[in-house]
Amino acid sequence: MTEDNEVQIAGMSIVIVCSVVDPASQNIKEHLLKLRDWVEMSVPGGIFDDLSAVYQSGNFYIIEVTEHHIYQDGIDRKIEEAGLDCDLLIFASKHKSADGRRLLTAHFTGNPGSADFGGYPGELSMAAPFALRCLLRNMAELSESIGFDVSMESTHHGPSDLDVPSVYAEIGSSEVEWVDQDAGDIVARSILSVRSGFCPVGIGFGGGHYAARQSELVLGSDISFGHNFPNYQLQFVDVDMFRKAVERSGADLVYCDRKAMSSDEKKRINELADEFGLDVLRESDIKGMEGVCWDIFRIFWHKVRDEGLSGRVKVPVGLKDKLSENVCDIFDFDVSNVVTVVIDNELLKLVRSVDAGGVKRLLDMSNVVYSERDDATISNHFYTFWNRDAEDFLTFIVDECIKILKGRYDTEYVFEENVLYISDERFSPELARKWGVPSGPMFGELAKGQSVMIEGNTVLPEMVHERTQKSLVLRNVIF
């Protein structure tokens, strides 16, 4: 994410563009005028061809035009020429669809393919991901009681020739909703609540126009999205369009709606992401990094992959405060600072055989980052930035694993030798046969500790069990 895409809080000027010919835009404008004290102002003539009015209230401006918003290419330059400050453009508009959904939306503009509704072919506007995040979250919070859905839309229509960060805020999807007073009030309040800030920014690929999974991530995780390309636009995403999306979004990562995309398309997008040095994160990865500084999460992400491991990077809740944005502001971490703890894999396998979820529960109480494979098993590599935490974790995990094993086996850990001795009583089919027990149900009864009768003789469980012992050298290491 770059400062070209998101502006600093101090001195941020927001220009709201409203259209006379758009009923939803007029609805939003009327509520904006009610919510703050505005002063109508004049600007030099000859700059705007379709100017209706200009209002100012603090750091907010309303510019009302007589034409549709989608044809306002270059309006950022006109605003500058008129002597107005503009760090962010918000287009207050209607959303139209045949299904007539009660819907509040936000999206960016541009034309990955042809320019059928304003803008230019193959051109993307400068996106404002944090503003989109603010809008959608404000809309969702304020609209809970009025029956409107909230969604991010994929990139579409004009204007595309905009170098100031911009975003659309819309009411949909029919004449009834466009003039709905509650909807107008909510969108107006959402616009006035927009602030600047920084968060990880993804560019999205796949799925439908309304980007359901991407919308969910904006509303429920720590990231936002820049430009988004649904399935019907993927054909236009070549190297040049991918580069534009990265640059015009300030992208940190790539997200694919994997279930909605073909294998070939996923492979192609992954290759483009590699070419531009961007990570492709899954939904679970994005949700898992909640509360963790993006730069720190990315360090662990790459550490896991540099060691040839796969799966999701998991950060226990108790560790997140130590890896938050505040820590990023204080320390300058990189991958060379990562301390790796390797726990003996046989120990973890043995614990898993006794208690399938035991290791996971221990890790959720721990102070290290770990990797969970796609089959939900845990890698034996664990990570932290602090040597003391690594040493404490090694002691903790070994002690707790032994406690779990003691619930099933007789165990003895010899610290000086770093050896774990494990003893077990096991049913022996061979001994059972020697006592005349045939294979079948009686084997099961004896294995469960129950006696059986053979030709009038009682065969006790202890007669057909044998004691085994094995030693496990714990190959644990910190480096």
Swiss-Prot record:
* Highest taxon of the lineage: Archaea
* Any GO molecular function: D-aminoacyl-tRNA deacylase activity
Per the UniProt entry, the Enzyme Commission number(s) are: 3.1.1.96
Keyword Metal-binding tagged: yes
- One Pfam family assigned to this protein is tRNA_deacylase
Q: What class of enzyme is it?
A: hydrolase
Q: Which SUPFAM superfamilies match?
A: AF0625-like
Name of the molecule in the record: D-aminoacyl-tRNA deacylase
Q: Which organism is it from?
A: Methanococcoides burtonii (strain DSM 6242 / NBRC 107633 / OCM 468 / ACE-M)
What is the taxonomic lineage of the source species? Archaea, Methanobacteriati, Methanobacteriota, Stenosarchaea group, Methanomicrobia
What gene is behind this protein?
dtdA
